Amino acid sequence: MYSTTVLATGTKDTSLVNRIFGLDMQLVVDVAIMGLAIFVLFLILSYLLFNPARELLQKRQDRIKEEMDSSAKDKKEATQLKTNYEAKIKEASKEVDEILSEGRKKALKRENDIVDEAKVEASRIVDRANKEIELNKSKMKDEVKQEMIAVASVMAGKIIAGNIDETKQKQLIDEALNEMGDETWQN
């Protein structure tokens, strides 16, 4: 605004120099007008720039808060899903254990059934063998009886034919018994 004029003679006007450095009423008014202009400019810029910037920052802050809330919610859901899956895994493991236990029980029962069936079959075989032995014994007894009858009839024929005395008769019976063996009579 103010400038110093240099005369063609090369001398400066000292009144102007004093005025630049001196505080007078004009300078105070200019500073007040400039301060008022800066204040008005600040209000206008605040309305035009700072409010949108604040709104932008507030929106960003709200969006970040929503994202944090959403991530906390997602984390909570993930934790809940994890606990649900762990519970399902435990339940499945328990079911597997139950199935294996049931399978073991069935296998053990089947094993016991097979052993019982084998015992029954073995008992039947032993009974059948005992019956066959008894049958063979009775056949042998019948054969021995038939043999004794045949020997007795031969002896009777000899006694009648030769009129054998009593000592001779005892001797013939003893011989017949020796031929058949003592075991036959003991069974």
Curated annotation (Swiss-Prot):
GO terms for cellular component: plasma membrane; proton-transporting ATP synthase complex. Keywords: ATP synthesis, Cell membrane, CF(0), Hydrogen ion transport, Ion transport, Membrane, Transmembrane, Transmembrane helix, Transport. It is found in: Cell membrane. It holds the Pfam family ATP-synt_B. It comes from the Bacteria. The chain crosses the membrane at residues 31-51. It is a single-pass membrane protein. GO terms for molecular function: proton-transporting ATP synthase activity, rotational mechanism; proton-transporting ATPase activity, rotational mechanism. F-type ATPases have 2 components, F(1) - the catalytic core - and F(0) - the membrane proton channel. F(1) has five subunits: alpha(3), beta(3), gamma(1), delta(1), epsilon(1). F(0) has three main subunits: a(1), b(2) and c(10-14). The alpha and beta chains form an alternating ring which encloses part of the gamma chain. F(1) is attached to F(0) by a central stalk formed by the gamma and epsilon chains, while a peripheral stalk is formed by the delta and b chains. F(1)F(0) ATP synthase produces ATP from ADP in the presence of a proton or sodium gradient. F-type ATPases consist of two structural domains, F(1) containing the extramembraneous catalytic core and F(0) containing the membrane proton channel, linked together by a central stalk and a peripheral stalk. During catalysis, ATP synthesis in the catalytic domain of F(1) is coupled via a rotary mechanism of the central stalk subunits to proton translocation. Component of the F(0) channel, it forms part of the peripheral stalk, linking F(1) to F(0). Belongs to the ATPase B chain family. This is ATP synthase subunit b. It comes from Lachnoclostridium phytofermentans (strain ATCC 700394 / DSM 18823 / ISDg) (Clostridium phytofermentans).
